[in-house]
Structure formats: structure tokens, C-alpha cells
């Protein structure tokens, strides 16, 4: 018994491409006779043939007016049948301009997807320029303002400042593989407190080499040259000029996909080195106790449960080796660390992008007098596009910092931030940011709480010229005496881009 929605072809073998309306009788009111399909009945007339021809024409007309039928179960949809033979050129045009119909899990033709409205790129965003197979986006930032506490210590007077910065982003435009590099450099001059002048240079690069469709090689590296925070707990209160430090490193590894399961293995090396600090009396404070090299490896297993969402589990181990076997107090500060975390990545373009994870970390120190450091591990970087005009960013970071404070093995630092960007107009963007951080010193009752709140406006005059104004307030509250401070920073700036 044929299905209700299957084409029912007419019995005329000379024109089999014609069909009648599903469920309709072949020739209403006429019964088959012994004459077959000769067209003549028993009285030698052509009435039977004429009736069949009329029924066929009615069926063709009705079939052409049938709406498309989409099955939600196992029934198959009636496919349109061309009533006239197409030319070869017409068939080629139809094959080129018509996408094949998608099938659902039952084999039925799935409904057409809803065509979303095209979203135009930022009309005030930088376009960059092409150099061979690379796209370059340079920028220059000139700003100035006032900082009420550049030293981030109690009792430090305020000062006006100027800042000059430059950036260059390089992105490959290859059909396979990928390479990105970001260079950022700046220098701040304090007019009334020159000892707090500070450089800041950051270089980051990452590359992906597509070995096969399933296997990729991953390489990344970074370099940072900057001045230490004047309020660093590792520095004494009589530091006249914050020390400079270098932090550099990189990782290399590979990623392989087994269908939906992705395995990523990385190994890396990180290096941190400090210069001497200058004290108020002109003497130098040796900070080589803080210099160390870290070796580590990590393994991640991710499984794509649905397009754009990949839960994962990740674990890693590392070893920190200091340049000096013992510090100035005769203490060995080498340590081993391990962590494990679970999380998920989001790649829902235009809706939610980023990663969030939670777990636990631990550091075991070679010095038996030091307590092991253990704590929760929270890391995230999420961007949520709430509306076409509003974007929400959430960030969390957990790290273990080295310490040279007597009796302290290390400091567990946790930082959280939320930023809201809203476009009042396409050329006027408002930004509000809230942040909180805590430093817990293992082996000491000291706990530092850090807060930040800021707000600003960006006026996009053209794609190449942006003006900005912002205000930021920072303050620290600690249970240790003499370290609390508050800082208010006002900034006006001009940004030139390409």
C-alpha cells in the first residue's frame, strides 16, 4: 500500500512524469474495462480516453497549486516534479543557484533555516592594511591626566602625568595555519614624582600549524618588561624607585581530534627576573631571591556536546626553581605545583564567547617549615552580547605569587572583574568596570583586599580617530598596619588608528 504522501503516477506509460493529486482517483466515475488503455470502449467510442485526459489535466493543475509539505515524522515530503523537460543550461543554473535540501535524522527534508539579518561590522572600527598575506593594525595612544597616589602607598602626594603608547597587531590571512602577534608599549611620565616613571612593554604571539585535518601543532610565547607595583608587599616602605622586572616564556604542544573528543598536550617554560630596587638612602636592595624559572606541562580533554559548547577537564604539574638555592634568610623556596579543573568553552558567535572553569590548586615547598599552599582555582574569560548595543565581560584569575617575606611561603591571589560596554550611539561608547581582588599570604595572618571601579566614554570621530575620557578609583584595605591607600585617576586621551 503506497504512502499517502508518495507520488502516484498516472497509468499512461507515454508520459510517466505526470502525476495526479495524492489520494485522488485516477479517473473519477470511470472503471477499468477489458479494452485496457486503447482508448475505445465497448461501443467503439473515445469517451473513455477523453475522460482520462480531462482527469489528468485536472490532477496536473491541482498538483501545481499544492503547498510544500514538510513531514515531522517518518513520512516523506512530496517533491515537485517538472512538467516540462529542462534544457541543459537551465539545469546547470538550477544546480548552481539551489542548495541541496537538508535531511533530518529520520530522512525527511528539514525546514529551511530562518535567514538572520546581516549585521554590519563596526563602521567606526579600524580596518588595518594588508601587507602580503598579513593584516596589520597599528595604533598610537596619547593621554594625560592626574593621579592622586602614584606610589600606591599611604601619604604619597598626587601628580599630573602624560602617557605615550603604541600598538601593532599582526594577523595572518592564510587558507591554512594561523599566526597572530600583538605588540604594546607605553611610558608614563609623572611631572612631580619622576621616580615613579615607568615603562611597560608587552609582546604576545601564538601560532597554529595544521598538520592534518585532525592534528594541529600549537606554539605561543610572551615577553613583558615593566616596573613593579610600588605597593608590592615584597618591597620595604623605604623604596625610592620601584624595580624593573622581565617575565618571558612560551609553550609548545599539539591538539588532536577524535571525532568530538579533543586532546591537547602542552609543555612550557616561564622565566621571571627582577632588577635591584633603589632605597631612599641611595642604597640598593637585592631582589634576586625572587628570580626563578618554572617548567610545566598540562593535559586537556574536551568533548563537544553541541556546536559551540565544549566541556573539558584539565590537569597540570609544574616545578619552580629559584636562581639561588636559599634566599637571604637561608630558606629554600623551590616548590612543585599541581592543579586540576573542569570547565567549558563557549563559541556561540554573536551571543556568548569565552571559557569558564573551576578546580583546585596546590603548591608543595621543599622547605619542610613552609606550609603547603592550597586553594580554589577559578579562571574565566566570558563575553556576553546581551543586546546589539550592550556587551558584558566577566573575568576571573587565580595565581600563586612568590614571596620573600619571612615565614611566608607564597601568596594566593584571586581577582574578579566585570565590565559593561554600552553604545549610546554607534560613535559613543560608555564603559563601566568593577573589580575585586584578594591576596592571602600563606604562613601569615595578612590578607589584602583590593577594589577598583571605573567609568569612561569613547567618542569615535572616525575609523582612525577616537577620543576618550575616564575616571578610575582604586583602594586597598589590609589587616596589616600602614599599607592601606586610595588612588583616584583622571585621564583624557587621543587614539589614532589605521
Which stretches of residues belong to each language-model region?
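Gram-negative and organellar
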Residues: 1-498
Amino acid at each position: 500500500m503506497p504512502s499517502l504522501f508518495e507520488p502516484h503516477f498516472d497509468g499512461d506509460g507515454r508520459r510517466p512524469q505526470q502525476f495526479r493529486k495524492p489520494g485522488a482517483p485516477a479517473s473519477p466515475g470511470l472503471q477499468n474495462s477489458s479494452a485496457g488503455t486503447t482508448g475505445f470502449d465497448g461501443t467503439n467510442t473515445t469517451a473513455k480516453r477523453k475522460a482520462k485526459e480531462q482527469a489528468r489535466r485536472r490532477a496536473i493543475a491541482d498538483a501545481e497549486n499544492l503547498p510544500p509539505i514538510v513531514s515531522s515524522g517518518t513520512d516523506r515530503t512530496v517533491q515537485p516534479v517538472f512538467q516540462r523537460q529542462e534544457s541543459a543550461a537551465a539545469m546547470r543554473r538550477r544546480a548552481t543557484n539551489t542548495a541541496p535540501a537538508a535531511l533530518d535524522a529520520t530522512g525527511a527534508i528539514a525546514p529551511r533555516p530562518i535567514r538572520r539579518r546581516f549585521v554590519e561590522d563596526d563602521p567606526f572600527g579600524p580596518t588595518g592594511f594588508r601587507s602580503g598575506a598579513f593584516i596589520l593594525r597599528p595604533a598610537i595612544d596619547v593621554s594625560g591626566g592626574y593621579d592622586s597616589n602614584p606610589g600606591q602607598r599611604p601619604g604619597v602626594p598626587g601628580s599630573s602625568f602624560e602617557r605615550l603608547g603604541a600598538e601593532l597587531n599582526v594577523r595572518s590571512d592564510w587558507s591554512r595555519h594561523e599566526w597572530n602577534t600583538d605588540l604594546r608599549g607605553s611610558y608614563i611620565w609623572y611631572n612631580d614624582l619622576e621616580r615613579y616613571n615607568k615603562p611597560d612593554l608587552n609582546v604576545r604571539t601564538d601560532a597554529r600549524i595544521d598538520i592534518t585535518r585532525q592534528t594541529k601543532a600549537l606554539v605561543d610565547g610572551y615577553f613583558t618588561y615593566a616596573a613593579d607595583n610600588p605597593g608590592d608587599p615584597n618591597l620595604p616602605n623605604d623604596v625610592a624607585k620601584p624595580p624593573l622586572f622581565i617575565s618571558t616564556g612560551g609553550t609548545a604542544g599539539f591538539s588532536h581530534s577524535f571525532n568530538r573528543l579533543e586532546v591537547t598536550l602542552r609543555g612550557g617554560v616561564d622565566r621571571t627576573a627582577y632588577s635591584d630596587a633603589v632605597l631612599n638612602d641611595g642604597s640598593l636592595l637585592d631582589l634576586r631571591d625572587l628570580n626563578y624559572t618554572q617548567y610545566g606541562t598540562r593535559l586537556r580533554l574536551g568533548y563537544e556536546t553541541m556546536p559551540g559548547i565544549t566541556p573539558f577537564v584539565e590537569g597540570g604539574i609544574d616545578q619552580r626553581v629559584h636562581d639561588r638555592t636559599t634566599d637571604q634568610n637561608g630558606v629554600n623556596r623551590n616548590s612543585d605545583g599541581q592543579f586540576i579543573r573542569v570547565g567549558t568553552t563557549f563559541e556561540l558567535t554573536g551571543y556568548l564567547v569565552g571559557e569558564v572553569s573551576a578546580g583546585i590548586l596546590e603548591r608543595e615547598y621543599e622547605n619542610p617549615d613552609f606550609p603547603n599552599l592550597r586553594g580554589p582555582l577559578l579562571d574565566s574569560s566570558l563575553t556576553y552580547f546581551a543586546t546589539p548595543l550592550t556587551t558584558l565581560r566577566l573575568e576571573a584569575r587565580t595565581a600563586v605569587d612568590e614571596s620573600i617575606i619571612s615565614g611566608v611561603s607564597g601568596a594566593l591571589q584571586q581577582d574578579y572583574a566585570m565590565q559593561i560596554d554600552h553604545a549610546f550611539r554607534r560613535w559613543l561608547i560608555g564603559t563601566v568596570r568593577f573589580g575585586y581582588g584578594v591576596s592571602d599570604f600563606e604562613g601569615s595572618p595578612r590578607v589584602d583586599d583590593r577594589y577598583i571601579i571605573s567609568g569612561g566614554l569613547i567618542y569615535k570621530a572616525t575609523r582612525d580617530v577616537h577620543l576618550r575620557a575616564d575616571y578610575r578609583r582604586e583602594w586597598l584595605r589590609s589587616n596589616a598596619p600602614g599599607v592601606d591607600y586610595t588612588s583616584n585617576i583622571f585621564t583624557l586621551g587621543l587614539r589614532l588608528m589605521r
